[in-house]
């Protein structure tokens, strides 16, 4: 800043004294009251630009920074299907791997807990108190799934909110042999229906999703066509 101001003053002197041939007056010239010299105006403009460029942006200007490291992936079930979220809200398996509706964001929301969000639609996969899988436009407690690696290196996704009351057995995300979603309380972790292979597409950074209340009546997934 000081170097820029000095340069402006030097340029002003060179304009007043070309070639250095004119003698410098010992008397200081005083600007009339209420007026500013060209040099002073340039300095004021420079200072205003520095304040604008160097000022710290407010939180509203910056917005929340992405802090959660997750992945964009396809979830391939051992039954031979890719998990797919359809625009009508239904969830099913498909043998085709070219559809963008099979792309999901796996976002960490706790210790070994993730939320599964459709990368295409922005909706979250959720499991209600009856074990039915559905698509939610908002992130709720029903959208949280515990992620664990099974002994054969397949990945299991269990509801973080619900389980069998008496036995404590987890409710798992699963597809049957026809590619239809199963009720979580009927999926066993030892069966192929619950075994998934995440096929990585890219690593991404995410903002923490805002938690909404679970609706009083959680919708179930519409039947797949």
From Swiss-Prot:
The UniProt keyword set, sorted, is:
Growth factor, Nucleus
Instruction: Give coiled-coil spans as residue ranges.
Output: none
Q: Which gene encodes it?
A: Fgf11
Record-linked PANTHER family: FIBROBLAST GROWTH FACTOR
Record's function text: Probably involved in nervous system development and function.
List the protein's name.
Answer: Fibroblast growth factor 11
Which superkingdom does the taxonomy of this entry point to?
Answer: Eukaryota
Tissue localization of expression is:
Brain and eye, and in a segmental pattern of the embryonic body wall. In adult olfactory bulb, hippocampus and most concentrated in Purkinje cell layer of the cerebellum.
Spell out the Gene3D superfamilies in the cross-references. Answer: 2.80.10.50
MF annotations from Gene Ontology: growth factor activity
Q: Cellular component GO terms, alphabetically?
A: nucleus
Q: Which CDD domains match?
A: beta-trefoil_FGF11-like
Give the main location.
nucleus
């Amino acid at each position: 800043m000081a170097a820029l101001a000095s340069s402006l003053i030097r340029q002003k002197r060179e304009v007043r004294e070309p070639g250095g041939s004119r003698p410098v007056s010992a008397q200081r010239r005083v600007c009339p009251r209420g007026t500013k010299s060209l040099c002073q105006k340039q300095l004021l403009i420079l200072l205003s630009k520095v304040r604008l460029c160097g000022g710290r942006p407010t939180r509203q200007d910056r917005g929340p920074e992405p802090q959660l490291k997750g992945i964009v992936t396809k979830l391939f079930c051992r039954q031979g299907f890719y998990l797919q979220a359809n625009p009508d809200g239904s969830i099913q398996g498909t043998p085709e791997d070219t559809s963008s509706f099979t792309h999901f964001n796996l976002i960490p929301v706790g210790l070994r807990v993730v939320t599964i969000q459709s990368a295409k639609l922005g909706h979250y996969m959720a499991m209600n108190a009856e074990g039915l899988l559905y698509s939610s436009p908002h992130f709720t407690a029903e959208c949280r799934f515990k992620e664990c690696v099974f002994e054969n290196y397949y990945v299991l996704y269990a509801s973080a909110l619900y389980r069998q009351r008496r036995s404590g057995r987890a409710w798992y995300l699963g597809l049957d042999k026809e590619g239809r979603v199963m009720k979580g309380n009927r999926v066993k972790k030892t069966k192929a229906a619950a075994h998934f292979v995440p096929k990585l597409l890219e690593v991404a950074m995410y903002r923490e999703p805002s938690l909404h209340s679970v609706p009083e009546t959680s919708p179930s997934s519409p039947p797949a066509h």
